[in-house]
Structures are given as C-alpha cells and as structure tokens.
C-alpha cells in the first residue's frame, strides 16, 4: 500500500490504517490516497474487522495535499492526467471527492485519531470518518476545499465566519462545536482511540452498520452529497481564477498562501 501501513488488533476486530509519510507531515500524494483507498477496501471486506481507525504517523495527522514532493512530481510525470482544466477537474474529483465519499460510506464505524496539524486535505479525510478523537495539541484548518463538508461539520454561520477569518482551530474549540468527539492528552491519543474502538466493536456489526447507514442517508436526503459535488464546481472555478502553484514552480515544496496567512495570524 506504499505510503499506508495496515495492521489489525490481536483479535482482528480493529483495523489500523496509518498515513506513513511523517517526513512530509503525511502530505497526501496521489499514491498515498490510492493506498488509503486500498486499505479501507481491505478493512471493509474483512469480516473480522468491526471498527476502522485512521491515524497519522509522527507528530502530525496530515498537512494536507502534496504540493510537490519529489515522489509526487515523479508520479505526475510517470502517470500524467490529461492536460488542461479537464485533467485537473478529473484528478480533483476522483482523488478528493469520489474517493472521500466512498470512505464516508464504508459500512463499518470509522474513527480518526488526530494529532498536530490537520490542514485542508487532512480535514477532508478526518471529516469522512464517523468519529474524531483529537490530541490536545491538534490544530485544524478548514477551507473551501474539494470535498466541502465544512458547512455540514460546523453549521453554515460558523463556517462562514471561520473561513473568512482563516484561523487555526484547536481541538477544544471543535469539541464544543461537535466536530471532535473527545480531546485527550497527546500521550493518551492511541490508547483512548483504541478504547473507544474496542467499546464500539462490542456492538453487533449489523446493528452498527444500519445505524451508520441511517444517519448517512438522513444527511443525503438533506442534500449532503449534492452539496459536496456542487461545491466542487465552485472550488474548480476558484482554482482556475488563480492557481496557487504557478506553472514552472511545481518542484518547489511550499505551503498554500492561505496556510501561511493562518500560521502568521
């Protein structure tokens, strides 16, 4: 699975899916996202697995999208998408929307264990999980990204305010808003997440699956899926209006300007 590590608990009931690019703060390359898709499919198809835990190796859960590490640039050269806007839209839809919707709909409970930075793409994959356990050092940064779940995660008014202010949010703030399920000391993140997963794994797997399906379908009836896919079109318009990584500078690993502003503030 490349940049993904996959393990299971001794009894096989809990699958641990780990983002394994700590040297790049688990930036999400194409290969990492493809490996994540394989890992989630493996866990979903394993009848012994009852709960899936998503976690990040190292000090940070995920710094977001890979803007140009050597491995990502090599992959873009070796496996290019079609040129132009059509290729960019296809890449964005397949890697960040279609895949994330699949992960949201995995018919088993999923938990994200978040520490350190959870920026943009990090928020996307954490949001797709059913529950989030966050360390007290976790810092989250949402935006109008490809999989725009934020209004559903936080509510419309709070979303407008936070995206306009473009400030990092700590775990306690997001627990109060209902996005984070619980906040624990950093050194207890792994054990607390496993304890929660173990408790949920005691639930009848069919009942757990039906509970998740009912809640997700309720959101879909309210327009979640349509909202996410429609918002992606707006995202693409924003990207076409002004690219954040100009052509010819793809080899320079950099942060998005919006992330730099948030870090300064």
Model-based region annotation:
Residues 96, 147, 156-159, 208-211, ...:
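A general structural signal for well-ordered alpha-helical segments in protein cores
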Residues 31-35, 95, 102, 192, ...:
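Charged catalytic carboxylate motif
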Residues 24, 56-98, 118, 252:
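Glycine- (often His-adjacent) and acidic-residue-rich active-site loop
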Residues 1-12, 61, 170, 191, ...:
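C-terminal alpha-helix plus adjacent terminal tail
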Residues 101-205:
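Crotonase-fold acyl-CoA enzyme core
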Residues 17, 21, 35-36, 54, ...:
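Terminal peptide-recognition signature
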Residues 1-57:
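Conserved CoA-thioester-binding segment of acyl-CoA-metabolizing enzymes
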């Amino acid at each position: 699975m490349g940049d993904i590590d996959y393990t299971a608990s001794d009894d096989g009931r809990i699958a641990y899916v780990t983002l394994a690019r700590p040297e790049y703060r688990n930036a999400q390359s194409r290969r990492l996202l493809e490996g994540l898709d394989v890992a989630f499919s493996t866990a979903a198809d394993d009848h012994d697995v009852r709960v899936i835990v998503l976690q990040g190796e190292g000090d940070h859960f995920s710094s977001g999208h890979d803007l140009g590490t050597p491995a990502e640039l090599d992959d873009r050269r070796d496996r290019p998408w079609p040129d132009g806007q059509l290729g960019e839209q296809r890449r964005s839809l397949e890697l960040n929307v279609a895949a994330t919707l699949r992960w949201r709909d995995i018919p088993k409970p999923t938990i994200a264990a978040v520490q350190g930075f959870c920026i943009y793409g990090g928020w996307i994959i954490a949001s797709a999980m059913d529950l989030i356990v966050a360390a007290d050092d976790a810092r989250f940064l949402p935006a109008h990204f490809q999989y725009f779940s934020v209004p559903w995660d936080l509510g419309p008014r709070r979303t407008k305010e936070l995206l306009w202010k473009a400030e990092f949010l700590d775990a306690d703030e997001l627990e109060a808003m209902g996005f984070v399920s619980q906040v624990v000391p950093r050194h207890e993140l792994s054990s607390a997440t496993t304890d929660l997963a173990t408790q949920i794994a005691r639930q009848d797997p069919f009942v757990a699956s039906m509970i998740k399906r009912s809640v997700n379908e309720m959101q879909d009836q309210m327009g979640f899926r349509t909202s996410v896919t429609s918002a992606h079109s707006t995202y693409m318009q924003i990207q076409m209006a002004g690219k954040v990584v100009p052509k010819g500078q793809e080899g320079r690993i950099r942060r998005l300007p919006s992330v730099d502003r948030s870090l300064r503030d």
